[in-house]
């Protein structure tokens, strides 16, 4: 049995999956915001509860908005303050008495999609999230590749490439990022970035969904904005694909529901790739909000 936990800022979602990777249990509980011991106890109690229910000890994987420090394995996170700076994996292993794996939630999203029936035979899968932020995870041979410092796939914190600056023009905004740097892709390619760029160029704030609706209706500013954004996306995606060369790319997050992306990227990306490279297949995520808990559970698949 595979147990997965999606630990967010407000709730912890638990999921249990059998050997066929079918979900057989679900539970959601509030995330203790400032009580670390209660956070550890909450996770341990869910493990013990479902061990008793299934009559076996499930493997344990956690996905959270952050990562482990490569040197001391403490948690680096902003959205789960109770876990910030704490040795969560070590304390859970001591409490529960078995191995625990922890990964960034974007990596869990990518792993969930990579283990979908249609993608299980693909050698590599790149998951990209175009949501409130922009991030990703890289799956190779069915496993997360997270690198020496657990930051592989953190494409949202690479910088806007020079050809993207040329494309945006001399009036291009230098946007700040939550990581304290400027010019990160997170600030431009996310749903938030989509809105920030519109506000910058047109002097008015609009929600992404309203911009997309206006685009469908042929409103001039929205059409111009979407055209600019699609080319920006193609430039940045091409840079990422050149570095990772994935077989399949899966998009998640709210902006991934904009169907025009799937029409435009295969047409626009090739001119920014090396001449020998082909644009990978780009598809929409199938597992939506359940991707985090699925991927966390699947961290233990061998």
UniProtKB/Swiss-Prot annotation:
An annotated Gene Ontology molecular function: zinc ion binding
Pathway of action: Cell wall biogenesis; peptidoglycan recycling
Swiss-Prot/TrEMBL GO biological process terms: N-acetylglucosamine metabolic process; peptidoglycan turnover
Record keywords: ATP-binding, Carbohydrate metabolism, Kinase, Metal-binding, Nucleotide-binding, Transferase, Zinc
EC number per UniProt: 2.7.1.59
Protein's job: Catalyzes the phosphorylation of N-acetyl-D-glucosamine (GlcNAc) derived from cell-wall degradation, yielding GlcNAc-6-P.
Entry's family note: Belongs to the ROK (NagC/XylR) family. NagK subfamily.
UniProt protein name: N-acetyl-D-glucosamine kinase
